[in-house]
Amino acid sequence: MKDLRLQKQEEKSQARLDYEAGLEFLKNGETAQAANMFHNALIGFEQEKDINGIANATDKLGDICAERRDFDKALQHYDRVISICQDQGDSISVFSIDKKKAKLHADCGKHEEAINMYLDIIDQYNAMRNPQGTVDTLETLAQVYVEAGKREKAADCYRTAASIHEKYKHRQHAEDFMKRADELLAPV
């Protein structure tokens, strides 16, 4: 009788094995090797017509490109993943990739695109009734506004975050956000 672990390993396609090897390389900080494995996995998944595999490998390639600051290539990968996820009706994954794209826009100085995406993300968190996600995104958006030279709008983000904390009786957090808003608007 075969070892169950070996049997399960034998049942996996080469593309799946390449993908898992890529994850291991990524975990160990070997991004060049990981990129190679994810690329091989992507080709294999495309040959197998494994839509989920294609999306997962493409997402990882996007992450690696973003880490390497190859923003255009990362956006291409993320846009492909979004297209696949939309076709599959997977709105949660689209939301996850939108957050990555917003960060990417902010990282490469495309402030207006980042701001618009973060505002949409806040709307989605509000629709999901997720105050923590809303506050975290408001905090990130405030940083983007500061980088874009829009200190008043950044202060508005902090005040909104403070009001959310106040609603949940988190007085200390609310005070901290109000202080940050005041500091942004204080004369230098």
Regions found by a protein language model. Give the residues of each.
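Intrinsically disordered, low-complexity regions
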Residues: 1-188
